[in-house]
Curated annotation (Swiss-Prot):
Its job: Part of the insoluble cornified cell envelope (CE) of stratified squamous epithelia.
Protein name: Involucrin
Annotated Low complexity bias: 78-159, 169-186, 279-292, 346-358
One GO cellular component term: cytoplasm
Keywords, sorted A to Z: Cytoplasm, Keratinization, Repeat
Top-level taxonomic group: Eukaryota
Amino acid sequence: MSQQHTLPVTLPAALSQEPLKTVSPPPNTQQEHTKQPTPLPAPCQEVPSELPVEDPSKHKEKHTTPVKGVPEQEHELQQQQDSQEQELHLGQQQQQQEYQEQELHLGQQQQQQEYQEQELHLGQQQQQEYQEQELHLGQHQQQTSQEQKLHLGQQQQHQESQEQKLHLEQQQQEPQKQELHLGQQEAQEEELHLKQQQQECQKEEVHLEQQQQECQKEEVHLEQQQQECQKEEVHLEQQQQECQKEEVHLEQQQQECQKEEVHLEQQQQECQKEEVHLEQQQQETQELQQHQGAGILEQKLHQEKAQSEQQLKGQLDWEEKLLDQQLEQELAKRDEQLGKKEEQLLEPSEQQEGLLEQPTLVPAPSQLHENQAAQVPKGEVLLPIEQQRQQEVQWPVKHK
């Protein structure tokens, strides 16, 4: 006799609570059973089930697997599908049981009752297991939700702790940053202060260099002024020498004028001599007229006298004009030179008074005249320039 695996048949609670109904077998089967009595099974013999029945432990494991990371709706749908599968499975089992019950009903009623009791016991046990599975699933879901909540809480606490740590670190770093910032500001301010001091020192050095340059320029300017003063002194000496030369030239001109006057006097004396000679000639002519024809001699004498007088007048006029022109030219040149010299003498004296603290002594025109008067030889009186000019202009007129 081959070994057969006996599997417990689970019944729903509704079937287990309802009273079992006796099903009358069909008439054909009754006749067959009456004709051929079937041997009843032993009381302890188990009826093998032809249909495969799922292991409840596997079904339990299937329902006890924790669903992690699945939403609650999906989990409920899965539970509904599992319950539907269980109902279908139970329906199949119920049909099989009814068929077996019909077969077993033909047996002993006692065995049927025992079998029903077993089925009831199995149904109750299965119901208890199902309830336990539901409780286990609820507990598991509750535990998973609690674990998730705890995990989320722990994560939040961890994040909050990390944020607090970061905040504390930032708070701790802020005074350090402030100290660094203050140190940097102080260092920058010190650098700026040092730069400003360096710039001020450079400005002072530049100012000192400028002052030194100005002092050097002033020294050079003073040296130039001294050189100019020396040049002016040399120029004044040269002007004095030129004045002396001009005075000598004027003296020479005066001497020449005196010579010309002497020459004119000599010419006048010659003219007088010629007049005397003419008078003598006239007397002689008169005497000749007395001896010879008076008319012819008088005409000749008159002609000769007129010619000689014209010649003398022409010479005198020409000489006077030359003298006048020479005197006018010399006087104009002399006036120009004296005016320029006076201006040149006055300009350096005014410039020296404005530039130098100790003005150089410039001889005034009165001092020049005094020096000139001192240089004139004894016995001669030096007249003023205007009187000399008037005398020079009037002198040739007197001698006409």
